[in-house]
Amino acid sequence: MSAVASIKEFFNTFFLLELLKGMKLTGRHFLSPAITVQFPEEKTPLSPRFRGLHALRRYENGEERCIACKLCEAVCPALAITIESEVRDDGSRRTTRYDIDLTKCIFCGFCEESCPVDSIVETHIFEYHGEKRGDLYFTKDMLLAVGDRYENEIAANKEADAAYR
């Protein structure tokens, strides 16, 4: 080591320059205003592509959209979707059972993307809980109820997102 380098190292160590540089940075951020969001009282805006609680949609005439193609069940990487179907008198298929286990679901959105009739969607609802494991097991009727309740919001989000697809 040269004499200049050893003198420089001595001054850095003796005067604790690294510590002073760190304290300067800490002081600068300490005096800046806080950007913390107080969550239950304040909420940040959500993207139209936010993926929350699932819902099944209906057509305007009240008929459920799901045609029991089972693409969502096949594409689900977590195997959280279970579908059973039967053939109706007119030859079309409809679901008799459509269950989503939210304890398995990873909210990837593949089910929504694979659905050819926009039946299964993920809403902006993220404030839900379950006290027992079975509370997070959503049946067809529960999913349809969520879809019926939030249909206007779902349609608005689909329309806002349509420009980017």
UniProtKB/Swiss-Prot annotation:
Belongs to the complex I 23 kDa subunit family. [4Fe-4S] cluster 1 binds at C66, C69, C72, C115. Its cofactor is [4Fe-4S] cluster. InterPro entries: 4Fe4S_Fe-S-bd, 4Fe4S_Fe_S_CS, NADH_quinone_OxRdtase_chainI. Its EC number is 7.1.1.-. The keyword Kinase does not apply. Coiled coil: none annotated. Residues 57-86, 96-125 form the 4Fe-4S ferredoxin-type domain. NCBIfam families: NuoI (TIGR01971), PRK05888.1-4 (NF004538), PRK05888.1-5 (NF004539). GO terms for cellular component: plasma membrane. [4Fe-4S] cluster 2 binds at C76, C105, C108, C111. It is found in: Cell inner membrane. Binds 2 [4Fe-4S] clusters per subunit. One of its GO terms (molecular function) is NADH:ubiquinone reductase (non-electrogenic) activity. It is a peripheral membrane protein. NDH-1 shuttles electrons from NADH, via FMN and iron-sulfur (Fe-S) centers, to quinones in the respiratory chain. The immediate electron acceptor for the enzyme in this species is believed to be ubiquinone. Couples the redox reaction to proton translocation (for every two electrons transferred, four hydrogen ions are translocated across the cytoplasmic membrane), and thus conserves the redox energy in a proton gradient. One of its GO terms (biological process) is aerobic respiration. This is NADH-quinone oxidoreductase subunit I. The keyword Ribosomal protein does not apply. It comes from Methylibium petroleiphilum (strain ATCC BAA-1232 / LMG 22953 / PM1). It catalyses: a quinone + NADH + 5 H(+)(in) = a quinol + NAD(+) + 4 H(+)(out). Keywords: 4Fe-4S, Cell inner membrane, Cell membrane, Iron, Iron-sulfur, Membrane, Metal-binding, NAD, Quinone, Repeat, Translocase, Ubiquinone. NDH-1 is composed of 14 different subunits. Subunits NuoA, H, J, K, L, M, N constitute the membrane sector of the complex.
